[in-house]
């Protein structure tokens, strides 16, 4: 499940405002604001989190899970080069 810090970081990496994420995901701006205020794992509807994650992934964000090698995070995928 996404962490609120990952959502804020993904928006920053893309240069998105909360309104941009709302438009891309179909999730209301007030809901995004509430989710981002949380300090821990998200406690919202699963469908809401799936829509947010899908919008970021469509924009090129790759989420990294917490594991034995390190904490959670994210990165921006490389753009495919035309040959």
Residue map of PLM features:
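A detector for short, charged/polar N-terminal pre-domain segments
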Residues: 1-2
């Amino acid at each position: 499940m996404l962490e609120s810090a990952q959502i804020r970081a993904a928006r920053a990496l893309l240069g998105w405002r909360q309104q941009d994420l709302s438009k891309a995901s179909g999730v209301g701006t007030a809901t995004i604001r509430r989710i981002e205020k949380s300090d821990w794992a998200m406690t919202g509807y699963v469908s809401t989190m799936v829509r947010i994650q899908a919008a970021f992934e469509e924009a090129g964000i790759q989420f990294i899970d917490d594991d034995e090698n390190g904490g959670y995070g994210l990165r921006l995928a490389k753009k495919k080069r035309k040959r």
